Amino acid sequence: MGSILMATIKEVKEQLAILRDLDDPRWASFEEDSRTGVQAAIRKRRKAILAELAEEERLEILLNYEKSLYARGIELIAGVDEVGRGPLAGPVVAAAVILPKLCKIKGLNDSKKIPKSKHEAIYNQVMKEAVAVGIGIKDNYVIDDVNIYEATKLAMIEAIEKLNPQPEHLLIDAMNLDLPIEQTSIIKGDANSLSIAAASIVAKVTRDKMMADYEQEFPGYAFAKNAGYGTKEHLSGIDKFGVTPIHRRSFEPIKSIIKK
């Protein structure tokens, strides 16, 4: 205890960082140090541990579907999701991801709930950890030809067919696919399955990069910012510069604009 009281605040912080359990008896020694800096460090570390425990619990819950399949001896489970159904421009992108058994990637969630600043890091972690990743892309011409729902299915099937090894079971975000693979359709799957969440972030980052490239090719529509969605800035670009080759002509207001 004497050595703790004699330690600098920096040294105390380093020792606190080692603690992982709120019931660790070493907390008592630190709490006897009345220095304001030490007490602040204790509160900060306790808060961090609580956040870590909450994240661990969240990830465990996200593995519920996967764990029920593991219990049946099924290990090659692919999460499948898409991004880009609603935009006025650009492709629909689907991803299929097989994660290792009981894999946990901190911060992984429905891509819409992940801060944009963290997208790239979590995407990189998924790509590093995954057993297999497949990506399917259907452009605006396919979307206009078969409709967005069917194009989404085609993108998902393409993503799954690119997986090596092939999955034994599919966990899909609110979709049923005509494939000879056992599958489970999950409403709001990207918020309820870790495998689907992994597919969600892969599809999101892949599509965002494509839209950023399209901004270079078609400036004036802010594609890197709006990802092709019908924002005020995007619609203003259409008014000024017209419809581009990547706009979906079966979507309003594009459909009405090209009829004028």
From Swiss-Prot:
Binding site residues for a divalent metal cation: 81-82, 173
EC number: 3.1.26.4
Cofactor(s) needed: Mn(2+); Mg(2+)
UniProt KW Metal-binding keyword: yes
GO biological process assignments: DNA replication, removal of RNA primer; mismatch repair
Location of the protein in the cell: Cytoplasm
SUPFAM superfamilies referenced in this protein's UniProt entry, alphabetically: Ribonuclease H-like
Enzyme class: hydrolase
Coiled coil: none
Cofactor note as given: Manganese or magnesium. Binds 1 divalent metal ion per monomer in the absence of substrate. May bind a second metal ion after substrate binding.
Protein's UniProt keywords contain Hydrolase: yes
InterPro entries: RNase_HII, RNase_HII/HIII, RNase_HII/HIII_dom, RNaseH-like_sf, RNaseH_sf
Catalytic activity: Endonucleolytic cleavage to 5'-phosphomonoester
Domain RNase H type-2: 75-260
Domain of life: Bacteria
Keywords assigned: Cytoplasm, Endonuclease, Hydrolase, Manganese, Metal-binding, Nuclease
Similarity section: Belongs to the RNase HII family.
NCBIfam families: PRK00015.1-1, PRK00015.1-3
Function field: Endonuclease that specifically degrades the RNA of RNA-DNA hybrids.
PANTHER family: RIBONUCLEASE H2 SUBUNIT A (PTHR10954), RIBONUCLEASE HII (PTHR10954:SF18)
Name under which the protein is recorded: Ribonuclease HII
Species assigned in the record: Streptococcus thermophilus (strain ATCC BAA-250 / LMG 18311)
